[in-house]
UniProtKB/Swiss-Prot annotation:
Keyword presence, Glycoprotein: yes
Coiled coil: none
Protein name according to UniProt: Protein STRICTOSIDINE SYNTHASE-LIKE 3
The entry's keywords: Glycoprotein, Signal, Vacuole
Residues annotated as glycosylated: 95, 108
InterPro entries to which the protein is assigned, alphabetical: 6-blade_b-propeller_TolB-like, Strictosidine_synth_cons-reg
Native source species: Arabidopsis thaliana (Mouse-ear cress)
Major location (coarse): other
Organism ancestry: Eukaryota, Viridiplantae, Streptophyta, Embryophyta, Tracheophyta
Location relative to the cell: Vacuole
Family the UniProt entry places it in: Belongs to the strictosidine synthase family.
GO-annotated cellular components: endoplasmic reticulum; plant-type vacuole
Signal peptide: 1-25
Taxonomy, superkingdom: Eukaryota
Length: 390
């Protein structure tokens, strides 16, 4: 009898989730939403290296509540900075005593772009205000290149101001979620477009869908052409050139791995997996020794692993009447935390730094090494963390 009652309750619950009569689910406004399998490697194959000392808890928190969502951090060719893009669409410059407005990407800025109390409040107007993500300086002329999530690849001169468009489409397909970039010695720009369907404001839907419309692209300043180098990717994110310029490393965010794309030599035009990651990667930056710092947004967990391999179960779960915030907390294992990993060119783990409980540093988006310090930005936090390397 008890089993019969439980079966009926489950049936009613399943029907409720299937039709979502009160539009309580996180995908209720997207009737055509689809989920796909993510070929995430087994947990047993992941790197075993961990930072049991939680060394990132020794970081210094700077500029608390002075910068909202500083995704990327850059220093100009003279070593000045940092520069960072924030949630209201501006690129800010630290002049040594205070933050000043350096540049912006949108020419449609209005009062909608004024500072807001919460980072989430900016999402609905990001397409109007712009949302700068990856930042890179051209070391030859001091131009700053910007990966704006909505406007594509932008460029602004050393004096700052309104950035101009470099490219916003490839192969007739608009850039929908421009994410990170790097520039070689000839001025070619390599960059990621995380999705051809979802814009940044719907990044959680992109993560949970597993769709594979992401691309890695190249802009040639001489021909003004943008070409696709790698396609059919699940949330490509960070990208950084190798020290000698013969390859770049990019990350596949949903799968959680690093791939090397060869630009020169007998392997030119091909790519290969060089590392499986502890979790879900964001930006990548190369240090002066040619090693790569990868910002890992969060560790993998059993929940994310199971959801990756069973898309129908994932979609059913998404139809539950629970908030996007709760969905996010499940993805990150219950609480935001911080992981930064240094890799060699061959994909060998050289160093792991963590704040596993998020006591000081959380949700790292980028790790920039400069003068013995790691500068860490976060698209979800309102500070920059600085860690002194031993």
């Amino acid at each position: 009898m008890a089993m019969s009652i439980l079966a009926k309750i489950f049936l009613v619950f399943a029907i409720y989730c299937a039709i979502d009569p009160f539009s309580h689910s996180s995908i209720s406004k997207f009737p055509d939403f689809k989920t796909y399998k993510i070929d995430m490697p087994p947990l047993s194959s992941l790197p075993k290296e961990r930072d049991r000392q939680n060394l990132l808890q020794n970081s210094e928190i700077r500029f608390l509540n002075e910068v909202q969502g500083p995704e990327s951090i850059a220093f100009d060719p003279q070593g000045r900075g940092p520069y960072t893009g924030v949630a209201d669409g501006r690129i800010l410059f630290w002049n040594g005593t205070r933050w000043t407005d350096f540049a912006y990407t949108s020419n449609n800025r209005s009062e909608l772009c004024d500072p807001k109390p919460s980072l989430l409040d900016y999402l609905k107007d990001e397409d109007i205000c712009g949302r700068p993500l990856g930042l890179r300086f051209d070391k030859k002329n001091g131009d700053l290149y910007i990966a704006d999530a909505y406007l594509g690849i932008m460029k602004v001169g050393p004096e700052g101001g309104l950035a101009t468009s470099v490219t916003n489409e490839a192969d007739g397909v608009p850039l929908r979620f421009t994410n990170d970039l790097d520039i070689d010695d000839e001025g070619n720009v390599y960059f990621t477009d995380s999705s051809s369907f979802f814009q940044r404001r719907k990044f959680m839907l992109l993560i949970v869908s597993g769709e594979d419309s992401g691309r890695v692209l190249k802009y040639n300043p001489k021909t003004k052409e943008t070409t696709t180098l790698v396609r059919n990717l699940q949330f490509p994110n960070g990208l950084s050139l190798g020290k000698d310029g013969s390859f770049f490393i990019f990350c596949e965010g949903s799968i959680g791995r690093l791939r090397k794309y060869w630009l020169k030599g007998e392997k030119a035009g091909t790519s290969e997996v060089v590392a499986l990651l502890h979790g879900f990667p964001d930006n990548i930056r190369t240090n002066k020794d040619g090693d790569f710092w990868v910002a890992v947004h969060c560790h993998r967990n059993i929940f994310t692993h199971l959801m990756a391999h069973y898309p129908r179960v994932r979609k059913f779960f998404l139809k539950l009447p629970i908030s996007v915030k709760f969905q996010y907390l499940l993805q990150v294992g219950g609480w935001p935390h911080a992981v930064a990993v240094k890799y060699s060119e061959e994909g060998k783990v050289l160093k792991v730094l963590e704040d596993s409980k998020g006591k000081v540093v959380k949700a790292v988006s980028e790790v920039e090494e400069k003068d013995g310090k790691l500068w860490m930005g976060s698209v979800l936090m309102s500070f920059i963390a600085v860690y002194d390397l031993p």
